[in-house]
């Protein structure tokens, strides 16, 4: 199974494609946290779209995640507007 893995940090977004044996197509871009949660989600979607032929997406993120609905339960003020962001819903609608 080919899986896009994304790690959203306070300063960098790191990603890679797991091909079942190892990570390939590793990428890294600035989070630009001060631009806010909505802009961050657009950056993440664009990054994921840069991969091809994947079957699943895994995301780890700064902040606390509500495991029931995949939204950000709490994020500090470094990413304005990130608390309450429905990350899972956004990704499901896009992909």
Language-model region placement:
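Glycine-rich phosphate-binding loop and adjoining helix at the ATP-binding site
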Residues: 37-38, 66-95
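Glycine-rich beta-strand-to-loop/alpha-helix junction loops that act as flexible
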Residues: 57-63
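Short, basic and Ser/Thr-rich N-terminal targeting/leader segments
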Residues: 11, 53-55, 95
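Short, acidic Gly/Pro/Ser/Thr-rich loop/turn segments
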Residues: 13, 64-66
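Phosphate/pyrophosphate-binding loops at sites that engage ATP/ADP/AMP, CoA/4′-phosphopantetheine
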Residues: 44-57
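Short glycine-rich, Thr/Ser-proximal phosphate-binding strand/loop in the N-terminal lobe
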Residues: 2-42, 71-74
């Amino acid at each position: 199974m080919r899986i896009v893995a994304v790690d959203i940090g306070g300063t960098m977004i790191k990603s890679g494609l797991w091909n079942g044996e190892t990570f390939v197509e590793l990428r890294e871009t600035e989070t630009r946290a001060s631009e806010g949660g909505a802009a961050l989600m657009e950056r993440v979607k664009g990054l994921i779209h840069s991969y091809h032929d994947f079957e699943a997406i895994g995301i780890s993120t700064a902040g606390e995640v509500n495991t029931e609905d995949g939204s950000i339960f709490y994020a500090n003020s470094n990413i304005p507007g990130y608390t309450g962001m429905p990350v899972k819903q956004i990704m499901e609608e896009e992909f």
